[in-house]
């Protein structure tokens, strides 16, 4: 079972910060948003897979696992996945969850979701991801948000986060 936070999230030192390679930016936190995980699991997106498999311990919202599991179910029902491919995707999702730091959807996150974001409109579930990243308590410069969603990408950049 993945670790769940009770309140404020851990600092960079406790979630796997690494010394930067020469000429690279320091990334203390890598937040994996649902679209990137789904892209890695179902589309085998090489860039998403690389980001998700980074040596930096990934952080994500508890919401991510519900969204990814639903995407797997939808793909199977639409016959875009064989039963074997569905089982493989579910196993990969479970492996990812075991190595993640999972952030609960707290009252603070939900309160933030109610306020405007820099680039509107933002869908509610996307706002939950953005608010979760903000709740980590790290400087935006120390957080990279891994996403395949344009609205999340645009807002993350506007909020000062690095984006992959």
PLM features per residue range, with description:
Residues 2-9, 16, 20, 99-151:
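Active-site neighborhoods of divalent-metal-dependent phosphate/nucleic-acid chemistry enzymes
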Residues 69-73, 134:
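Short, amphipathic alpha-helical segments that act as regulatory/interfacial helices
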Residues 32, 162-164:
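Short hydrophobic/aromatic-enriched beta-strand-loop microsegments
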Residues 50, 58-60, 73-77, 83-103, ...:
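Anionic, Ser/Thr-rich low-complexity intrinsically disordered regions
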């Amino acid at each position: 079972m993945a670790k769940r936070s009770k309140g404020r999230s851990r600092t960079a030192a406790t979630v796997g910060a690494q010394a930067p390679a020469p000429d690279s930016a320091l990334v203390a936190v890598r937040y994996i948003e649902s679209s990137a995980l789904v892209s890695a699991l179902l589309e085998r997106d090489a860039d998403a897979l690389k980001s998700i498999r980074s040596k930096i311990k990934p952080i994500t919202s508890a919401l991510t696992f519900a969204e990814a599991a639903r995407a797997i179910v939808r793909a199977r029902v639409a016959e875009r996945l064989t039963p074997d491919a569905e089982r493989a995707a579910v196993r990969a999702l479970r492996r990812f969850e075991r190595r993640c730091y999972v952030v609960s959807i707290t009252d603070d996150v939900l309160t933030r979701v109610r306020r405007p974001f820099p680039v509107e409109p933002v869908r509610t579930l996307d706002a939950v991801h953005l608010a979760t990243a903000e709740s980590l308590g790290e400087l935006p410069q120390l957080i990279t948000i891994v996403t395949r969603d344009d609205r999340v990408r645009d807002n993350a950049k506007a909020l000062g986060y690095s984006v992959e």
